[in-house]
Curated annotation (Swiss-Prot):
It is found in: Secreted. Belongs to the DEFL family. The keyword Transport does not apply. This is Putative defensin-like protein 63. The keyword Secreted applies. GO terms for biological process: defense response to fungus; killing of cells of another organism. It comes from the Eukaryota. One of its GO terms (cellular component) is extracellular region.
């Protein structure tokens, strides 16, 4: 009797797992992230980090900003602002 009970429990757990995974797949919405070009407003002060850059960007009505080390290289990071 114990083996039959174990198999029934495993069966119901399997059915429950499949039903939840099918539910999630059916309800998933695809979110398209658009690649946006940053608006770089000037060089970053390496000693201060991202905080002054973010504050400057938010004061200019951007959502956020940070020091971008890829725009002009590691030696000359730029403060780049983003809208979203």
């Amino acid at each position: 009797m114990d083996i039959r009970k174990t198999y029934v429990i495993i069966f119901f757990v399997g059915i429950l797992t499949i039903s939840f995974s099918s539910y999630n797949i059916g309800q998933t919405r695809l979110v398209v992230i658009q690649e946006q070009e940053p608006h770089c407003i000037g060089p970053c002060e390496i000693a201060f980090g991202n905080r002054p850059c973010n504050e400057e960007c938010t004061s200019q009505q951007y959502a956020y900003g940070f020091c971008d080390y890829q725009t002009k290289g590691e030696d000359n990071p730029q403060c780049c602002c983003y809208t979203s």
